[in-house]
Design a protein with these regions (language model features):
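Transmembrane signal-anchor hairpin modules in multi-pass inner-membrane enzymes, especially those
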Residues: 1-99, 109, 113-132, 183-199, ...
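Loop-to-helix entry and N-terminal half of a specific, functionally important transmembrane alpha helix
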Residues: 12-17, 21, 134, 197-203, ...
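Transmembrane alpha-helices of multi-pass inner-membrane enzymes
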Residues: 42-48, 220-229, 361-364, 371, ...
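A membrane-periplasm/extracellular boundary helix in multi-pass inner-membrane enzymes
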Residues: 145-148, 207-212, 217, 221, ...
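TM-adjacent membrane-interface loops and short helices in multi-pass inner/ER membrane proteins
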Residues: 165, 285, 292-339, 346, ...
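Amphipathic alpha-helical repeat scaffolds of TPR domains
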Residues: 477-494, 506-536, 557-578, 599-609, ...
Length: 759
């Protein structure tokens, strides 16, 4: 039985809804690449069927206000890419984000296909499927959060599921919880009953937002939901929904009471020990994350003023951020201040695509709201009952999504849901008064045989097929294959199969051809693997030289690329282990790095290490002090200063800096150094740091009984009964001579005689 094209498109759309489940550890950036690749394959197959339907007259391309704004936005981001700082990166993006013009165009194409083929009933079927899919998705996320493992995704400290990021999960469930609310209201309209099964899904999916601890998601969902209930309470169009009005008023009052109670108890153990409530009550512009986002938005605005019309180009926020970096971000978030996104979607759009990009982006929301407001006005018309409620929910979805995006950026799951919802809204607005159609192919009057229409149809099909085939092979499948090969190369490096790794690397570069975005992913991926998994040796010289050469080629296009320059310096440092002349090259590269990012602590830390290796101790000290002026919590800088004073035979200052290095988590490589620093900390009774040090020592020498004895005593000093007993017993297991002392120690612990525990 031959399936109609529309039916096939419907099932392909459902297949798109399952792409958020796709995670593969065999690709570089496992939570990103497979989802984006499969979605693009599905959309391009859908596009071919769609063109076939148009040619056969089974559907028409309808243009209303919303679809026109999307076309304008698609054009603006292309112009911005051409005028930006790196067209390749703007157009194709990389493995880490898989967005760019090419990625966004796929979502816009997805919108046009579903908006022109499906009617409202089709969309309702898709939405129902999506709500149940998301409910299952949330269930699996909870299993993973509880310690389970599903596929390659294992337990995470926060609820994130297959997204890999709690914030991504939050926005996904903003859409789905409110879609469930849409079906709840539809059922309510029919039954007039407050409770129906959809309410359970609304509550369940809303709770997942709060369990994830995503504050932007909480705010987005909260304001979207608030918009619905206040509209039901105060809007004249809601006057016939008396029961909903009462329920909304009750919900509003209950919500105010709940928030008031939670915030008044924010300093109590009840709130502090509940992760979701603690995250909720920590919402503040003074919170480090909030302050960092605000500073990044200021940087985005400063960058916009440099390129006000079409911006720096999509995906090119990183160079803008580096050039206009605000050092205050380091003080606020010392461990996470390097942004390749503004973490504020509107401001990022402004910086990367300029004022024209931002206006066209905002017009998408304006057009969608205009359609929904027009839909509300149909409430009193025959066969239009309930339109006010339904439009209200979709307005809330757009509000929640937009608010959440003020705190983050878009990604696969958010784009998928956004353009799916836009497709539905577009169909709601498809009336003769609000839309126009692309004319069908002309038909002759039958008196003469006109082959032009048929030839035109055939030509359109051939061109479409060729374009889609080329796009799939070169722009979709090839990047996926290269992503997999990056991981294969990294695995070879971890096995110390260096010859095979080098051959795989060269083969991957050859496959990438002239696509700079792919070459950059390959080079950065392998350089990061060198930093994390490879012990430098002279037989790696050809590999390292090749990496440096490729890095130099990429830097001709992106001289501002901090990561490339940093990696180059690290590789040169590796080579200096067998070629002392390379240390000077590393120094020059590090000095170039200072010009790119003078306010980055890592920049000066690298220089401090290089100067120390060159035995230029005064310069090393100067750079280490610069690091601490930028980030007073940098453990390595304290360690370098400790080495400096130790070299100067100034033991008092050396010990002071070594102790600070320990407090901020420096990983010492020498067991004796750890013991000496721990002894210094005993005088200050800093048992928390002592415990961290002795745990490091166990990793260095797991058979040293004395370390277990000291660790047991340290845990005893902080009244951690369970761990004190555990390590005392371990000491006795390793050396039976400690058995009696261990039993005496445990007796002290059991009796609560903490003061008698020796240091």
């Amino acid at each position: 039985m031959k399936l109609p094209y529309k039916t096939i498109l419907f099932y392909l759309t459902l297949a798109c809804l399952f792409t958020p489940f796709l995670v593969s550890s065999n690709t570089y950036f496992p939570f990103i690449v497979t989802k984006a690749t499969v979605f693009r394959v599905l959309v391009e197959i859908m596009a071919l069927l769609w063109v076939l339907m148009i040619v056969k007259g089974e559907t028409k391309l309808k243009l209303n206000k919303l679809s026109k704004t999307l076309l304008i936005y698609a054009l603006i981001i292309l112009i911005s890419a051409f005028l930006g700082v790196n067209f390749y990166w703007s157009f194709f993006s990389g493995n880490e984000r898989m967005e760019g013009v090419f990625g966004i165009w796929h979502f816009i194409l997805f919108f046009f296909i579903i908006a022109s083929v499906f009617d409202l009933n089709d969309f309702k079927k898709v939405f129902k499927a999506e709500v149940f899919i998301s409910a299952f998705y949330g269930f699996l996320a909870l299993i993973i959060y509880a310690g389970g493992r599903i596929g390659v995704v294992s337990a995470t400290p926060r609820l994130s599921g297959f997204t890999g990021n709690p914030s991504y999960l939050g926005i996904y469930f903003i859409f789905n919880s409110l879609l469930a609310l849409y079906f709840y209201l539809e059922e309510f309209k029919l039954s007039k009953k407050i409770f129906n099964p959809w309410l359970l899904l609304v509550v369940y999916e809303a709770l997942l937002i709060f369990i994830s601890g995503t504050r932007g998601g909480m705010i987005g969902f909260g304001l979207g939901f608030l918009y619905i209930i206040t509209s039901l309470i105060f809007s004249q169009r809601a006057k016939e929904y008396h029961l909903l009005k009462k329920l909304s008023l009750f919900t509003l009052i209950a919500g105010i009471v709940f928030l008031g109670a939670v915030f008044s108890l924010k300093n109590t153990s009840f709130v502090k020990n509940n992760f979701a409530l603690e995250r909720l009550t920590s919402i503040s512009l003074k919170d480090p994350t909030g302050m960092a986002r605000l500073l990044s938005a200021q940087t985005a605005f400063k960058s916009f003023k440099e390129k006000p019309f079409f911006g720096w180009g999509p995906e090119n926020y990183e160079p803008a951020y580096l050039k206009n970096f605000n050092p205050e971000v380091v003080k606020v978030l010392p461990g996470d201040f390097y942004f390749d996104r503004a973490h504020n979607k509107p401001m990022e759009v402004l910086a990367t695509t300029g004022i024209f990009g931002l206006i066209s982006y905002l017009l998408i929301f304006v057009a969608a709201f205009w359609i929904l407001e027009q839909t509300k006005k149909k409430e009193g018309l025959p066969a239009q009952a309930g339109q006010f409620l339904f439009a209200l929910v979709f307005e809330a979805i757009l509000i929640g999504y937009f608010i959440q995006n003020v705190f983050i950026f878009d990604f696969h799951e958010s784009y998928l849901m956004f353009f799916l919802v836009l497709g539905f809204i577009s169909v709601m607005g498809d009336t003769p008064e609000t839309s126009s159609e692309i004319p069908r192919f002309a038909r002759n009057d039958g008196r003469t045989k006109d082959f032009v229409p048929e030839l035109t149809k055939g030509l359109i099909l051939i061109v479409s097929f060729c374009l889609i085939f080329y796009s799939l092979s070169q722009f979709v499948i090839k990047p996926y294959s290269i992503s997999k090969n990056i991981i294969t190369t990294i695995k070879a490096l971890t096995r110390q199969d260096y010859d095979n790794a080098y051959q795989l690397y060269k083969k991957n570069l050859y496959s990438a051809g002239q696509f700079e975005n792919l070459r950059k992913d390959i080079v950065i991926g392998i350089e990061n693997a060198f930093a994390n998994y490879v012990t430098p040796s002279e037989n790696l010289k050809p590999f390292i030289d090749d990496l440096i050469s490729e890095t130099d080629k990429l830097l001709q296009r992106e001289p501002w690329n901090y990561r490339l320059v940093m990696n180059k310096a690290q590789l040169q440092l590796n080579e200096s282990m067998w070629d002392k002349e390379k240390i000077k090259e590393a120094e020059k590269t590090a000095e170039d790095l200072v010009k790119i990012a003078p306010a980055f602590p890592q920049t000066h830390l690298l220089l401090a290490k290089i100067y120390f290796l060159e035995n230029d101790l005064e310069k090393a000290k100067e750079e280490a002090e610069k690091v601490l002026s930028l980030n007073p919590q940098d453990s390595t800088a304290y360690y370098i200063l400790g080495l400096y004073y130790s070299n100067k035979k100034d033991n008092e200052n050396a010990n002071k800096y070594f102790v600070q290095a320990a407090r901020y988590g420096y990983l010492f490589k020498d067991k004796n150094s750890i013991v000496n620093i721990a002894n210094l900390l005993i005088q200050e009774k800093d048992y928390e740091t002592i415990i961290k040090l002795y745990l490091q020592a166990i990793n260095l020498d797991s058979k040293d009984t004395e370390i277990y004895v000291h660790l047991a005593a340290a845990y005893g000093k902080i009244h951690d009964k369970e761990k004190a007993i555990y390590y005392a017993q371990k000491a006795a297991e390793l050396d039976p001579n400690f058995k009696q002392a261990s039993e005496n120690f445990i007796q002290l612990i059991e009796n609560g005689e903490w003061d008698k525990i020796p240091d």
